[in-house]
């Protein structure tokens, strides 16, 4: 076979393999997020380690670590806001409700290798704190768009962590 035919054959084969390459694992998780698929992709695409995850365990670990980081950042933001706006509902969000968010993500991370069902449950339960914060603020007639956006993001990240850990085999 002459070099040009060999080059053409190799090019054709590589194009076939590239076109058959499956999407990244995080994209599969985001597809499962249904109507929130686009937001899921937007949140995760900028996380290079998550985008390069090679298997479901690695993906789950990276997603839950990311969730824990974002939950902690959100709680710290709320604690800072509490200093300038001491409303009881904001205090409850910053402490009680977001203690639950951070604690559930931390628990999920700790259970990944030993009890995937509990890790999955905890990832989902983390979103409850953000939801409860929204309810507490609404009852107190407090409308702070930054907190609403924060809660919305944490609920989405909780859903993403739930969907990622749901891919793990039961142990």
Residues covered by each model-derived region:
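Terminal membrane/secretory targeting segments in land-plant proteins
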Residues: 1-25
């Amino acid at each position: 076979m002459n070099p040009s035919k060999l080059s053409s054959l190799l090019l054709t084969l590589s194009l076939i393999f590239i076109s058959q390459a499956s999407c990244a694992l995080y994209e599969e998780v985001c597809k499962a997020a249904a109507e929130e698929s686009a937001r899921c992709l937007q949140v995760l695409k900028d996380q290079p380690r998550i985008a390069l995850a090679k298997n479901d365990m690695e993906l789950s670990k990276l997603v839950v670590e990311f969730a824990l980081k974002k939950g902690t950042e959100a709680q710290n933001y709320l604690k800072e806001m509490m200093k300038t706006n001491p409303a009881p509902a904001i205090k409850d969000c910053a402490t009680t409700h977001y203690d639950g968010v951070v604690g559930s993500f931390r628990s999920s991370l700790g259970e990944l290798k030993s009890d995937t069902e509990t890790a999955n449950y905890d990832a989902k339960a983390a979103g409850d704190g953000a939801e409860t914060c929204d309810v507490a603020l609404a009852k107190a007639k407090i409308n702070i768009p930054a907190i609403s956006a924060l809660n919305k993001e944490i609920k989405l990240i909780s859903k993403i962590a739930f969907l990622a850990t749901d891919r793990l085999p039961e142990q």
